[in-house]
Amino acid sequence: MSSSYYVNALFPKYTAGTSVFQNASGFTEATSCAFATNSQRSSYGAGASAFPAPMAGLYNVNSAIYHGPTMYNTGYNLNSDSYNLRCSALDQNIPVLCSDLSKQGCEKLDQTNVHPQAESNFRIYPWMRNAGPDRKRGRQTYTRYQTLELEKEFHFNRYLTRRRRIEIAHALCLTERQIKIWFQNRRMKWKKETKAGSSSTTSEEKQE
């Protein structure tokens, strides 16, 4: 029993060459692919349009979307210009919006001009400034009074406690870090002096 028997039994009302849609205004006859003849199937080639003639203008890639003739133009008396009214208004507003972004209001304000009075009243000390990675730290210079007081303290105490270091820093108008570094350098100098003195005494004893 051939397969055509089942096809005819299941679909008795469909015959070869019959169209799926009835003839209507604005549409062409489109035959079913399953029941089309060989001559009709060969017409669906690469060059054939995928859509009917009235819809080709709407989906044509090469032409504008709204300029092609459609089946709605005749029914509602719409021209191609009516579709471009809203789009033209948006196109005109786009450069206006983009030009607003380049105004001075979008630029970052200079922080130096925000609070000029507050910065003039605020006193910045040299040790409060942020030192960059390429900037060399200058050598700390001490006055004669500061050096004298530090030498006195070092004569009695080689190492300082934190509490004593804070007291000296407030008394001499220095920071704790400066006091700590001075005592570290002074201890290194003292060790070199004692080491040199001990070596000289041993050499003198050997000569005797």
From Swiss-Prot:
Higher taxonomy: Eukaryota, Metazoa, Chordata, Craniata, Vertebrata
GO biological process, alphabetically ordered: anterior/posterior pattern specification
Keyword DNA-binding on entry: yes
Function: Sequence-specific transcription factor which is part of a developmental regulatory system that provides cells with specific positional identities on the anterior-posterior axis.
DNA-binding region(s), chain positions: 135-194
Keyword Signal among UniProt keywords: no
Organism the protein comes from: Heterodontus francisci (Horn shark)
Protein name (record): Homeobox protein Hox-A7
PROSITE patterns for the chain: ANTENNAPEDIA, HOMEOBOX_1, HOMEOBOX_2
Subcellular location: Nucleus
